């Protein structure tokens, strides 16, 4: 039986759906994997040949935002995210989207 998330020391603990437009102005949808590490949380996403890993942050939300910021640096726009899995539990797409304003 797996440990509850509050006891899990390291590894993937959440998956967040990320959607938006890629630098070629094509829509995309991927998963940001949020991992617990010794110093906090970090997120990562793969898009075609690109792997983006955010900085280590103290909260899950900050870890997701770190990935979004890096995607924006690569030219991704109209980005929004929402949690889809907490551990093994599917959230049935009931969570609210978080929209991120484009960089000027």
Report each predicted region and the residues it spans.
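A short, exposed loop/beta-hairpin motif centered on an aromatic-Gly-Thr core
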Residues: 46-62
């Amino acid at each position: 039986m797996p440990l509850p998330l509050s006891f899990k020391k390291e590894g993937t603990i959440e998956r967040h759906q990320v959607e938006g437009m890629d630098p070629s102005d094509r829509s995309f949808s991927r998963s940001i994997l949020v991992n617990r590490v010794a110093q906090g949380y970090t997120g990562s996403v793969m898009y075609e040949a690109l792997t983006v890993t955010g900085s280590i942050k103290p909260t899950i939300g900050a870890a997701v935002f770190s990935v979004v910021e890096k995607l924006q640096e690569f030219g991704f726009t109209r980005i929004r995210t929402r949690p889809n899995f907490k551990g093994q539990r599917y959230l049935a797409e009931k969570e609210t989207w978080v929209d991120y304003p484009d960089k000027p």
